[in-house]
């Protein structure tokens, strides 16, 4: 068996096209332009690149992009004052604070200062709680992207056995909540799970988000299962730096029914879902119907 390759890059392009279409209609019918504000503190190179990509794609779908680049010495009071202004700005529908923040800033305090309705990363404690209790919320972008791809590939997920390897607040826990919301039977596993391979082999859906390069091999996978690899790891191989996932793609692809590659799988969906969340936030703020197929 050779697994179907789930092309996240192409899927993300489709999501962005849907977002752009909805944005154009919002402008034409209601005179509204969804606005996304991104706050970057410091000069972390990876964050600089990521923020640049977010801004570019925001403009490409017709949204307004507001970038706030602050020095690494910015005080907590200054950052909170900026967030307060963005919370009250009617042109801003989504706010994203790029993590990690410099060590002198309290990330939890900063994230929870956001208006939950504008928290397009879905990290505010209110959104976390609402997701966990099955209420309407802003959903973290990476798990939302995974869910979109699973729905597209498998259709109805009800009754399927799902194993999420990883228990982070950013991916593992919200991914499990989303799968529960689809009526899957969900197991959360992690690096200390006893006989992890046996647990994973029970999964119709296997989501790897443990942060260990190529930890999940073909021996962990039930024949025909759908494997979503969230991992992004840089390793040295043959004298070169290579980007790999948490899944050993070569061995897994011989067993799985479908699998996301790294790169080109889950990664592109994260920014696409950020744009989708910003669109959703704009619609909610203005009492308009939410876009179908772009939310959980």
Swiss-Prot record:
Q: What's an example Gene Ontology biological process for this entry?
A: methionine biosynthetic process
Name of the protein described by the UniProt record: Bifunctional protein FolD
Which GO MF terms are attached to this record?
A: methenyltetrahydrofolate cyclohydrolase activity; methylenetetrahydrofolate dehydrogenase (NADP+) activity
Q: State whether keyword Cytoplasm applies.
A: no
Q: In which pathway does it act?
A: One-carbon metabolism; tetrahydrofolate interconversion
Q: Which organism is it from?
A: Cereibacter sphaeroides (strain ATCC 17025 / ATH 2.4.3) (Rhodobacter sphaeroides)
Q: Enumerate the InterPro entries for this protein.
A: Aminoacid_DH-like_N_sf, NAD(P)-bd_dom_sf, THF_DH/CycHdrlase, THF_DH/CycHdrlase_cat_dom, THF_DH/CycHdrlase_CS, THF_DH/CycHdrlase_NAD-bd_dom
Question: What assembly does the database describe for this protein?
Answer: Homodimer.
Give the keywords, sorted.
Amino-acid biosynthesis, Histidine biosynthesis, Hydrolase, Methionine biosynthesis, Multifunctional enzyme, NADP, One-carbon metabolism, Oxidoreductase, Purine biosynthesis
Q: Which GO terms describe its cellular component?
A: cytosol
Tell me its family.
Belongs to the tetrahydrofolate dehydrogenase/cyclohydrolase family.
Q: Which residues form a coiled coil?
A: none
Q: What is the lineage of its organism?
A: Bacteria, Pseudomonadati, Pseudomonadota, Alphaproteobacteria, Rhodobacterales
Per the record, a Pfam family?
Answer: THF_DHG_CYH_C
Q: Does the keyword Oxidoreductase apply?
A: yes
């Amino acid at each position: 068996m050779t697994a179907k390759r789930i092309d996240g890059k192409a899927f993300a392009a489709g999501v962005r096209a849907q977002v752009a279409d909805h944005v154009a209609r919002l402008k034409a019918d209601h005179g509204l332009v969804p606005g996304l504000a991104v706050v970057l503190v410091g000069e972390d190179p990876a964050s600089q690149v990521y923020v640049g990509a977010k801004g570019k794609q925001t403009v490409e779908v017709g949204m307004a992009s507001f970038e706030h680049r602050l020095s690494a010495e910015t005080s907590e009071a200054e950052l909170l004052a900026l967030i307060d202004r963005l919370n009250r700005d009617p042109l801003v529908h989504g706010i994203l604070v790029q993590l990690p923040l410099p060590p002198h800033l309290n990330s939890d305090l900063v994230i929870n200062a956001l208006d939950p309705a504008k928290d397009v990363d879905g990290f505010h404690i209110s959104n976390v709680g609402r997701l966990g209790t099955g209420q309407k919320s802003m959903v973290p972008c990476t798990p939302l992207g995974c869910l979109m791809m699973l729905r597209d590939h498998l259709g109805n997920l009800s009754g399927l056995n799902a194993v999420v390897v990883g228990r982070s607040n950013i991916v593992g826990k919200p991914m499990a909540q989303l799968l529960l919301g689809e009526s899957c039977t969900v197991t959360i596993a992690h690096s200390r799970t006893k006989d992890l391979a046996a647990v994973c082999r029970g999964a119709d859906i296997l989501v790897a988000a443990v942060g260990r390069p190529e930890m999940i091999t073909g021996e962990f996978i039930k024949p025909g299962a759908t494997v979503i690899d969230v991992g992004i790891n840089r390793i040295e191989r043959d004298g070169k730096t290579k980007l790999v996932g948490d899944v050993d793609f070569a061995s897994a692809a011989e067993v799985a029914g479908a699998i996301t590659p790294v790169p080109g799988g889950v990664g592109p969906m994260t920014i696409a879902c950020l744009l989708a969340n910003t669109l959703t936030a704009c619609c909610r703020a203005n009492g308009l119907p939410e876009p179908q197929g772009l939310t959980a």
